[in-house]
Design a protein with these regions (language model features):
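N-terminal accessory/targeting segments that precede structured cores
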Residues: 1-128, 151-179
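Hydrophobic residue at the +6 position relative to the catalytic HRD Asp in the kinase catalytic loop
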Residues: 282-286
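ATP-dependent phospho-/nucleotidyl transfer catalytic cores
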Residues: 77, 84-91, 103, 150-155, ...
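Conserved beta3 strand of the Hanks-type protein kinase catalytic N-lobe
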Residues: 132-133, 279
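Short acidic/polar mixed-charge low-complexity motifs
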Residues: 136-138, 291
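Glycine-rich ATP phosphate-binding loop
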Residues: 131, 138-146
């Protein structure tokens, strides 16, 4: 898809959203008159539409939706709850594309990877994760970036900045907000996330902070199999910390997990000044066989 066609597709979605919001603000569009219940119903419909539209637009907009789902100061609660579904709704890309990216990034080093599972453990807006074994016997996961993401991201982020400028000039939606600043910050963060070498450095630093705490396990980086678009980490299975039933069934005390998690965050903030900013439950699994660990 050319840059112009991509921009037109994005603007079509933006203008449709603006038209829907304008329509919903008009009392005469509600049969029998507007009331709180009808307005809330419309909001849920629009939030559902927006979530589906962001999924159709792809990675950069899925990531934007995920960021907005953590901003109740910008969007109503109903919108935030609907957008939160983007955390788990991203479709995977094909295994052949996974293999192509690995070959492009790792070259002959791919020979070290055996038993690469074609089914991803999970898929996200930027990448998906596959379990594998190395020739050494080490169990790992490979985070593989979606193909063609760099060019697409830059196109999308350029349009996002244009949209932000339009929103800022709106008499209602621009009041009390700095949309261009949010677009610039979004651009800075997302472009940095495209380089998995940065994430690898952060992961290694984060692991170093907790080497003296045997209650907390953080996967090590396999540097020789990591690159700009591939990140190789030790495989550490676990249970989502918000899956209370599964924790109890495994003999793990959820309260103990919560206490360890809270203590680790205090240590990150107060002692190290370097902390993990993603509180998604899937990011913080509890090991399935160690009731005192997280």
């Amino acid at each position: 898809m050319t840059g112009l066609l991509r921009a037109l597709r994005i603007w079509r979605s933006v203008l449709t959203l603006l038209l829907l919001l304008w329509w919903d603000a008009q009392s005469w569009t509600y049969p029998g008159g507007a009331n709180a219940e009808l307005r809330e119903q419309r909001q849920r419909q629009r939030a559902h539409w927006l979530t589906a539209e962001l999924l159709r637009l792809g990675s950069a907009f899925i990531k934007l939706g995920q960021l907005l789902s953590a901003r109740p100061d910008i969007l109503p609660a109903g919108w935030v709850a609907e957008l939160a579904a983007l955390q788990d709704s991203v479709p995977a890309f094909g295994f052949a594309e996974v293999q192509t990216v690995l070959e492009q990034e790792l070259g002959q080093r791919c020979a070290e990877v055996i038993d690469l599972d074609p089914e991803p453990l999970g898929a996200a807006s930027l990448a998906q994760v596959h379990r594998a074994s190395l020739r050494s016997g080490r169990q790992v996961v490979l985070k593989v970036q979606r193909p063609g993401l760099d060019r697409l991201f830059r196109l999308d982020l350029d349009v996002m900045q244009q949209v932000a400028a339009v929103l800022q000039r709106h008499p209602s939606w621009g009041r009390g907000r700095d949309w261009p600043a949010m677009a610039r910050e979004c651009r800075r963060v997302l472009l940095r996330e495209l380089d998995f070498r940065v994430e690898a450095q952060y992961a290694a630093r984060f692991r170093q902070q907790f080497l003296d705490d045997d209650r907390i396990r953080i996967p090590g980086v396999v540097w020789e199999l990591s690159s700009r678009r591939v990140l190789c980490l030790d495989y550490l299975p676990g249970i989502k910390i918000n899956d209370r039933e599964a924790l109890i069934e495994a003999g793990i005390n959820p309260s103990a997990v919560a206490e360890i998690g809270a203590a680790s965050y205090l240590k990150q903030l107060v002692r190290f000044g370097f902390f993990h900013a993603d509180l998604t439950p899937a990011i913080w699994p509890s090991p399935p066989t160690e009731p005192s660990s997280t």
